[in-house]
């Protein structure tokens, strides 16, 4: 029972840690894209690269908001088991994609130990398994939906 009460804060701790790591990857990739040139202009001016950086920013903003929401729920004394599963599943997947896009932007050096991005990318993969893999959380979310429906079917309720 005690372990169950600690799951939501533990999930959030992982999410916060990896949000910071993803932000570090984004910072490194952004600086690289500003300095490195290809075909006569900085990488950041190429649509494929700047769209990846924009996607990263969107994903990290959504992750930050989701984490803050569950943290607020916990501060209010709400167990937030369902919501912490949603956040853990979505944030772990999205932040892994952020790190992957950063590796892509960095090109060859993205997979070497020349930057910390490679280490973060490698270390971030198991994050999708900590405190239960994404599939386990999706199963728990679906089970909750089967029992009680969705919180989003009543837009006034939130």
What feature does the model see in each segment?
Residues 4-158:
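Alpha-helical interface subdomain recognition
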């Amino acid at each position: 029972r005690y372990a169950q009460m600690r799951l939501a804060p533990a999930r959030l701790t992982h999410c916060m840690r990896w949000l910071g790591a993803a932000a570090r990857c984004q910072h490194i990739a952004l600086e690289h894209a500003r300095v490195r040139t290809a075909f006569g202009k900085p990488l950041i001016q190429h649509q494929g690269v700047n769209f990846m950086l924009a996607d990263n920013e969107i994903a990290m903003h959504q992750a930050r908001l989701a984490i803050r929401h569950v943290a607020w729920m916990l501060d209010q004394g709400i167990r937030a088991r369902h919501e912490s599963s949603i956040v853990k599943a979505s944030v772990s997947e999205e932040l892994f994609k952020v790190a992957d896009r950063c590796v892509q932007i960095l090109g060859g050096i993205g997979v070497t130990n020349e930057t910390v991005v490679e280490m973060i990318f490698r270390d971030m993969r198991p994050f999708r398994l900590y405190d239960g893999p994404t599939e386990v959380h999706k199963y728990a979310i679906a089970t909750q939906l089967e029992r009680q429906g969705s919180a989003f079917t009543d837009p006034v309720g939130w």
